[in-house]
Amino acid sequence: MTPGPASLLTENIIGLEPSFGRGDESYDKIEKQVLNKLKKISGHNQIVRLQGAASFALEIMVSNFLYGKVLIIKTGIYSDRLHDMSLASKKYYKKIKKIEYVDWDKLDKINKKFDWVVGCYVETSIGLKVPIEELYILKKRLKSKLAIDATASIGLEKNHKLADVIGYSSCKGLFGLTGGAFIAFNKLPKKYITLFNLNLFNHLEKKMTGPYHAICSLKGVLNKYQKFKYSVQINKKKNYEKNEE
């Protein structure tokens, strides 16, 4: 029950302006403001913005951060793509050594040590929320790090700061236009991916066109973020009560 990519608000349109992204002081101020607010929402101190869907951000996250033994939590279509990305990364970059794909309701049976636990906070395909607090407890128990697909949870759910790295898009719970994606984290990865578009550092250094207008669309929305978030929560509650009747 998250807002879909088709969401279009007055604030999205008002925020749009001609933007180039390099040597554009007006845009630089907007981007700094938006990224600072996004870091505050997620609780991370570093963020990368890029042009594309959340799946692109997640592929960069998987390719640059994951290594060693990886446990992926199976929840549905969204976790399937994390699994596919991890398999590809294991094949082509050789940093991931082993992958296990385990159903979300069988995690109590996992006792082995992993380098990374990967999963979706909210699995939109079946309307399932796996509390990030429980994933954090699992991470600590398995002595691992936590990577989260926050596509359907960012902006609407709490405690994303419990994850070591997250990936998400500019729409859905952030109420921006489609076309922007973000990776938030606290520590830079040690891995180095040579493919230009999958290299996290190339995006950090802004070596390619960024999601300029998606970011502009977030400027006005994030100023009223709590209002829009509350509206979604009320609608979710009403839909739940209606279905219970």
Listing of model-derived features with the role each one plays in the protein:
Residues 1-19:
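N-terminal amphipathic/basic leader segments beginning at the initiator methionine
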Residues 7, 171-240:
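Active-site C-terminal subdomain of aminotransferase-like
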Residues 87-95:
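Short helix-loop-beta junction
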Residues 15-60, 64, 81-85, 234-243:
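Conserved N-terminal alpha-helix of the aminotransferase class I/II PLP-enzyme fold
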Residues 65-80:
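Conserved PLP-anchoring active-site segment centered on the Schiff-base-forming lysine
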Residues 102-155:
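Active-site phosphate-binding strand-loop segment of PLP-dependent enzymes
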Residues 160-171:
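Conserved active-site segment immediately N-terminal to the catalytic lysine
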